[in-house]
Swiss-Prot record:
One of its GO terms (biological process) is co-translational protein modification. InterPro entries: Peptide_deformylase, Peptide_deformylase_sf. This is Peptide deformylase. Keywords: Hydrolase, Iron, Metal-binding, Protein biosynthesis. Fe cation binds at residues 94, 136, 140. Transmembrane segments: none annotated. It comes from Desulfosudis oleivorans (strain DSM 6200 / JCM 39069 / Hxd3) (Desulfococcus oleovorans). One of its GO terms (molecular function) is peptide deformylase activity. Pfam families: Pep_deformylase (PF01327).
Length: 173
């Protein structure tokens, strides 16, 4: 397994959205395993394929209390098909938007449908942290970042900070 590079804002791939997975083959299985290795190496709780520069509708996550067992879940072609309950607002961070933590409103309960890594239909009724993580990762597949859900002020301050870093890096080369 390989730890993959995490794509960070403002990379275009993060805004492009993802295409459905057509074939579950050895190449996809390797991507899943590499994504898991990457997620754990970066202490993440979830990872979307677009975050490792793959334009596929694929997410992995692990919200278990025993993360050392690395019992991550895989959802291929995930779709939120139902939301229920009130909205909750939680502080979220993102590996692709480093150094930003912001309150994001999410549905408290969601139903997600997709397929597992063997291609079997999957229905997940999630609440709490699992619901938040699934919505966050599916947002990635739709080209939405937590930055897009942040307040306008926070969004503008973060964008300026990133542009300043890019300009400094450009000048150093």
């Amino acid at each position: 397994m390989t730890v993959l590079d995490i794509v960070t804002y403002p990379a275009d791939v993060l805004k492009d959205g993802a295409l459905p997975v057509a074939n579950i083959d050895g190449k996809l299985q390797q991507l899943i395993d590499d994504m898991a290795q990457t997620m754990y190496a970066h202490q993440g709780v979830g990872l979307a394929a677009v975050q490792v520069d793959s334009g596929l509708r694929l997410v992995i996550y692990d919200v278990s209390d025993q993360r050392e067992k690395q019992q991550f879940r895989v959802v291929i072609n995930p779709e939120v098909v139902a939301v229920d309950g009130e909205c909750v607002s939680e502080q979220e961070g993102c590996l692709s938007v480093p150094e930003l933590r912001t309150d994001v409103k999410r549905a408290a309960t969601v139903r997600v449908e997709g397929v597992d890594r063997e291609g079997r239909p999957l229905v997940i009724d999630a609440e709490g942290l699992e619901a938040i993580v699934l919505q966050h990762e599916i947002d990635h597949l739709n080209g939405t970042l937590i930055l897009d859900r942040a307040s306008r002020l926070k969004r503008e301050l973060y964008k300026r900070k990133v542009q300043k870093r890019i300009k400094q890096a450009w000048q150093e080369t």
